[in-house]
Amino acid sequence: MDTLTAPTTQSEQPPPPLTASLSRRYACDRCRSHKLRCNRDLMTSTNSPCQRCRKARVKCTIGASIRVGLSPEELKNGENVHRASPGRSAGSHRTASTPSNHAPRSHGRTFTPESAHQAPPYPSNRSMSGSMRLSPVPWLDMISFDGAQELNFDGSTSGLPMGSHTNGSGPLHAPMGGSTSSNTSSTFLDVRPPLHTPASSKPQQEAWRTGDDSTDLRLLSQIPRTRGGGVTDPAAGLTQQHPAGVTSSAPLVSHDHAFAPPQTSIISEPIPGDDLPAGGRPPTWFPARSRAGSTPSPTELKDACIQKLSDLSASLMKDLDLIITCKTASSFLFTPSDKTAAGYLFKTLDGSMTEDNAVARMLYGSERFLDIIKLFNQLPSLPSSSLSMPAAAAAAAAAASYGSTRPVDSDDAYYYSDLEDTGDIRSRNPTPEDRGNEQWSILQAYLGRAGQGPPMGPSQGSSSRSTTTNCSSSFVEVQKPDVPSILVILSCYTCLLKIYETVFFVIQHVLECSPANPSGTTDIPHTVRDLNINGFFLQNHRTLQIKILIQVSTYMLDSIQKSLGTILSDSMFQALLKTLMKEEGCTITSQGEETGMQGVRDLIRRVEEMLA
């Protein structure tokens, strides 16, 4: 007779034994990542790929699935094991047959930081009495040490006083040290991370992970501190005061946005030269001083002008070489019989329809030369000696008002005794100003004995001041252009004159080859293209374009001559200019200043007469 037995409940059924390969997922990795149903026949073979992977011609893999949760044995025994600890779960599966015998967990498996943060702060010491329990987390870089602490081999920390760190509430959250086994010589540490890691320790943990030693220094340098030793929170606007010798256990910076890079002085510093007057303000290409807010010195301004003149000279030389080459080629390749005026002017001026128009580059170069010369003339005077007139005059006036009757050849004892008899209270303790005045009077007396100037005495009165002013004025000379300035200005000046001469020579030759009435012909090419006056274009008025070019060129030449007034009068500039004109075969005026513009002005006048 068959007896009916009571059905066993699910909790009383023994758990099924697991194989060494652990449980396997039904869906493959590719279908799980795409969230698709895996059409895989497990009845045929466990190693056969699914239909989707076979169709995509990819390798079908199934990752191992580790059981998550507590085993019935652990629930029955009541052991405090966290449900998210894979190490403990795997250990419980391996010891399912003998749940009371717990072997030490192996650290060969892979652990994640998430599982470490979810671990309890203190391990259970059940069945672990008399021995040290190892931490399931095998890394040490999750500990957030303070900047002044060092981890010793005995588990203690050394460094600056930690204040409230001694009670275990500081940045060193894990219990260091614990207990030491009596039968072993090595020390084991429980370095379990805390349950809640502060947000401020994330950069420090990253620094420990990557080995970056400069992170702590950057964090400390970004904290604004007050005079009382407190740390100011830039986000909350609060100041925490700490007693002397005690380091706060609070996080250094409690907000992630507080780690923004500080503003540098390079962005906010003023542009050098902005404080110059409006009349003599240099352009943006002038050199800047290394110190922010300082005005460039006259020497730097002059060097910048010379550099710009050198660049302009190189550009003008290229333009001059181009126009001379075109003029020579046009003259030799074509004869006046088969050469039209339009073709001649077009080839000589290198294409008036392009940006390389010789007329446009001539006027543009003249404008740049005028701008640089105006700035060059506005440079302040440079003294030829380090002793300036105001300082010397002030020292001489102070020495004259001192009223000392000391002979130059007397000794100091006689001098001080004389001052004491006259009741001068400064004889006992002479000030540095008095000593400077005395040295200045000695210098003046030495110059008088040497025949370089009259000696200064107390009886000269007002004449001493005028003598001092005259002597001091010899230290400052009138500004004269130096040799580099003269050479670079002369180079630009001669190139411009040669370009003007070549352009108007070509225009004159074109007008000579034109019909008798040049005002009615249309064979003259454009010299001033796309010029209009409120919609009135000059396309059909070729001679009017030449007249406008004559007026503009005359104005530019007059402006250049006026700006070079002081430089043209220099003897060295005149000598070099006359030498160049002799080499070119130009006529030189015997009297007066030589400007070199006479040949260009004659050409302009002849062209203007032909258009009249």
From Swiss-Prot:
What Gene3D superfamilies does the record point to?
A: Zn(2)-C6 fungal-type DNA-binding domain
Q: Which CDD domains match?
A: GAL4
Where is there biased composition of kind Basic and acidic residues?
Answer: 73-82
According to the UniProt record, where is the region Disordered? Answer: 1-21, 73-130, 154-249, 451-470
Concerning PROSITE patterns, the annotation shows: ZN2_CY6_FUNGAL_1 (PS00463), ZN2_CY6_FUNGAL_2 (PS50048)
List all Low complexity biased stretches: 458-470
Keywords carried by this UniProt record: DNA-binding, Nucleus, Transcription, Transcription regulation
Question: Which locations, inside or outside the cell, does it occupy?
Answer: Nucleus
Supply the name of the protein: Transcription factor ffsR
